[in-house]
């Protein structure tokens, strides 16, 4: 590829992603990670005590662990300054937990995801679609035929409230527990949003689900969590698309 073509490709990419919506948040924490921050996140989500305690235990593990410096094949993260990151921003929208109809979203949120290329044709070709803006899922939809078979595709915050037994059993317990490394502990303390997928026994979901994640604010960290419980005979691997501005400042 010529240098002119490289430049055109970079220009097209920047034109697509380098835009920012000037929007007010409904709630956001201060920069950095403290016990107060973790409690505020849990309180804002009206979480049960068991999830709040898990967050606080993860915070303790984070504070005790050194910054990893020798991960094979991974970039050096020793210079990452969590004290300069805002870990939680809830956008100012009326529907928490994700609107089920795209038209119910505020126009500015719709416009943001339309600019990122989420066409109706693609949404109709998927089993389910989720979209996260900052720290919250703003849209979540599952095709009715899968819901009738007992398949669950919802945001993680709703799953904590409506499927507590499943979340409590599987959330960061065996795959990647907070004790695995410092960033796993960080995630366990401040996670927000993300997708929950449950496929019951003797059920196969042939079509994929897809989740989109958008970071709009400067200096924020987005810590979405995806939990997949597939007890059925098969499920298509969920796809995810992280659309983020071409950042010129620290984000995580």
Set out the residue ranges of the language-model regions.
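Glycine-rich and polybasic anion-binding loops at the starts of cofactor/ligand-binding domains
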Residues: 2-245, 251
């Amino acid at each position: 590829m010529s240098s002119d073509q490289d430049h055109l490709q970079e220009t097209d990419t920047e034109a697509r992603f380098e835009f920012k919506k000037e929007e007010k948040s409904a709630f956001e924490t201060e920069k950095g990670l403290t016990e107060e921050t973790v409690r505020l996140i849990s309180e804002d989500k009206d979480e049960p005590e068991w999830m709040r305690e898990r967050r606080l235990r993860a915070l303790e593990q984070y504070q005790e662990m050194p910054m990893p410096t020798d991960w094979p094949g991974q970039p050096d993260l020793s210079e990452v300054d969590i004290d300069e990151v805002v870990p939680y921003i809830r956008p100012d929208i009326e529907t928490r937990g994700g609107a089920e109809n795209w038209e119910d979203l505020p126009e500015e949120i719709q416009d943001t995801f339309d600019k990122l290329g989420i066409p109706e044709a693609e949404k109709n070709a998927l089993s389910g679609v989720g979209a996260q803006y900052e720290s919250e899922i703003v849209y979540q939809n599952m095709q009715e035929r899968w819901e009738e078979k007992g398949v669950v595709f919802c945001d993680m915050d709703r799953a904590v409230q409506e499927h507590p037994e499943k979340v409590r059993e599987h959330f960061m317990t065996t795959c990647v527990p907070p004790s695995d490394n410092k960033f796993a502990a960080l995630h366990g303390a401040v996670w927000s949003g993300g997708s929950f997928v449950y496929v019951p026994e003797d059920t196969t979901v042939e079509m994929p689900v897809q989740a989109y994640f958008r970071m709009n604010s400067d200096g924020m960290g987005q810590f979405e969590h995806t939990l997949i419980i597939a007890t059925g005979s098969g499920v298509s691997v969920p796809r995810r698309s992280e659309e983020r501005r071409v950042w010129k400042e620290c984000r995580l």
